[in-house]
Amino acid sequence: QVHAAVLKDLGRCDILVNGAGGNNPRATTDNEYHHEAKEGGKSFFDLDAAGVDFVFKLNFQGTLLPTQAFAKDMVEKKAGCILNVSSMNAYRPLTKIPAYSAAKAAVSNFTQWLAVHFANAGIRVNAIAPGFFVSNQNRGLLFNPDGTVMG
């Protein structure tokens, strides 16, 4: 439906930017290292499968599904560009966010696969891997309640 609306309003897609991304508190840990785990804290063993699934659906399927929808136009034209937003976490994962790091690694790997898959179709596929941005979503992972950086 989205593809049809875009095609109707804007025409064929020449450049696709897959920028979906995010995390979920149920897919994070409270401590950087296992030996630091405290009673009542969330450890690796407490990761919620639904939270991890949410993170993978948002990040990986948020790249896969738009590519399936919009790359068809590029294949027909034998031209196009797909830019996926990965993360430096794909290459050097931060602690406490295992699902996000793994999902972005999947995006990076998928990007490499797509680049080969569409090479002879005239479609260029690349990814960018920005560093870390502080947001309300991740502030609690980086800062103490008093605003100082966690050490």
List each model region and its residues.
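Conserved amphipathic alpha-helix within the SDR
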Residues: 1-11
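Catalytic Tyr-X3-Lys loop
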Residues: 14, 35-64, 79, 83, ...
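Conserved mid-core segment of classical short-chain dehydrogenase/reductases
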Residues: 23-53, 76, 96-99, 139
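A glycine/serine/threonine-rich, flexible loop-to-helix segment
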Residues: 29-35, 40-41, 120, 132-151
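Active-site helix of classical SDR
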Residues: 67, 103
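Alpha-helical segment proximal to the catalytic Tyr-Lys
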Residues: 72, 116-117
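Residue(s) in the substrate-gating loop at a strand-loop-helix junction
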Residues: 87
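Active-site loop-to-helix junction immediately N-terminal to the catalytic Tyr of the SDR YXXXK motif
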Residues: 93-101, 113, 141
